[in-house]
Amino acid sequence: MIWVAVVITMLLFILVAKPTGIYLEKTFQGSKKLDKVFGPFEKLIFKITGVKEYNQTWKQYALSLVLLNGFMIVVVYFIFRLQGVLPLNPAHIEGMEPTLAFNTAISFMADTNLQHYSGENGLSYLSQLIGITFLMFAAPATTLALVMAFIRGLAGKELGNFFVDFTRALTRVFLPITFMAALVFVALGVPQTLDGAVTAQTIDGAKQSILRGPVASFVSIKELGNNGGGFFGANSTHPFENPGQMSNILQMMLMMLLPTALPFTYGRMVGNKKQGRILFVSLFMVFLLGFITITTSELNGNPALNGMGIEHVQGSTEGKEVRFGTVFSSLYATVTTAAETGAVNTMHDTLTPIGGLVPLVNMMLNTVYGGVGAGFVNIIMYAIIAVFISGLMVGRTPEFLGKKIEGKEMKLIAVTILFHPLLILGFSALALSTSLGTDAISHSGFHGLTQVVYEYTSSAANNGSGFEGLADNTPFWNITTGLVMFLGRYFSLITMLAVAASLKEKTVVPETVGTFRTDNSLFGGIFIGTIVIVGALTFFPMLVLGPIAEFLTLK
């Protein structure tokens, strides 16, 4: 029965992807029906804020994005610092320490949601609503806007206006869907209230304080926006965030909804629907491989315990919730790192070595399917690399969407693809070379190395999940992961927007018999191979020293 439920869940991922992709295309390309519904409200917003609806250059688009995001980071930073004297603080929580406020503000603006604090004890209701939830909408709206400009550039069209795209992402995508999802979560038992904690009496007569809050609205945008941060410290293992299997499946659907839809949106916007389908199918195969790997490893249990003759019919149950079970915990771990969300319904630090390797690889690749917008930019980056390598092998000038890929584009892509591993491995080396970093490690040996690398991988990929055995709420970890999140977020977005702007100016080369097609299974295979060879092998030495070595030790 459990496998039937898994198959149904997978089918739901597939069935909703195309309709959502079509809706996104109509949202950002213009639709008379949608304009009638949302247009008056959006024009009012533009009038109040003084936004002019004109086409921007790629530099203007990128500058608008960075300035708006930077302003939001500063505002929310001061909310966190001053929450102790601000209203809506029934628990009388003190203001955040400076480096923690710095880390948290960047974390949520970068759509990472790395949390070096415990949600229910670290933030007031005002900080949760005005600070955290506000950024949970703004962050994915930023990248959804940018990816639309990116696709327009690839299609040879004007990039559009960042503020217009940003507003439409909020009014036409995130607000309507999260409103409906929040109502469903409330029906499934997720609380939604501004009242303070409830004091309950336990069976043995002791008193227990049960924290609650506006959780349903928080969870809906947490998952849809690929944010991942928890209202509670336990994240989606907490019964108030994720009461049962229905809420668990709904959360996974929300996480996958936009990332899986974007290949179809892309196909329609560039006039090559078949290429969009090829990208979707290719990435789904990689996703399935990851799920099969982690599930097999977790069901086989811990090799060290198996050798002692301990029963493991349910697999490795350490760190997992009984109400979800091993299989759905494995699926959730695959989804949350494939979609770069970072929400967890099981403790990733307790996964088996190979089980923990899958989330780590998903984040290192950052393409299967990646987070809202940012992940799809990486997908196209790998697609262009695949075309470039194929062109070199047959002695032809590489072409993508009928436009020649030349030195300028490849230099930008080369810098972008190297920057991700440089952030992860460079900062990991820094942490391992100083006691400021190593003092946080709770396990010596191979697992300790994995804890460190996982933290920086999660930060660079804007995922936010963690091996929570790492004691990371220190100035060193707050500052370094904050820098990694900021750089990992904005560097690749800006460089790839420059690539799209460069391709926009090029003329379309007529297709010939010798043109390498990017809408067939051959390209799909080369695309997957490029991801594995260029992406995975970059990190292979680290994976050998970390989870693979730990696995061999346990065996």
From Swiss-Prot:
The chain crosses the membrane at residues 2-22, 60-80, 130-150, 173-193, 246-266, 278-298, 374-394, 412-432, 483-503, 525-545. Coiled coil: none annotated. It comes from Bacillus cereus (strain AH187). This is Potassium-transporting ATPase potassium-binding subunit. It is found in: Cell membrane. Keywords: Cell membrane, Ion transport, Membrane, Potassium, Potassium transport, Transmembrane, Transmembrane helix, Transport. Belongs to the KdpA family. One of its GO terms (molecular function) is potassium ion binding. One of its GO terms (cellular component) is plasma membrane. It is a multi-pass membrane protein. Part of the high-affinity ATP-driven potassium transport (or Kdp) system, which catalyzes the hydrolysis of ATP coupled with the electrogenic transport of potassium into the cytoplasm. This subunit binds the extracellular potassium ions and delivers the ions to the membrane domain of KdpB through an intramembrane tunnel. Its main location: membrane. It holds the Pfam family KdpA. InterPro entries: KdpA (IPR004623). The system is composed of three essential subunits: KdpA, KdpB and KdpC. It comes from the Bacteria.
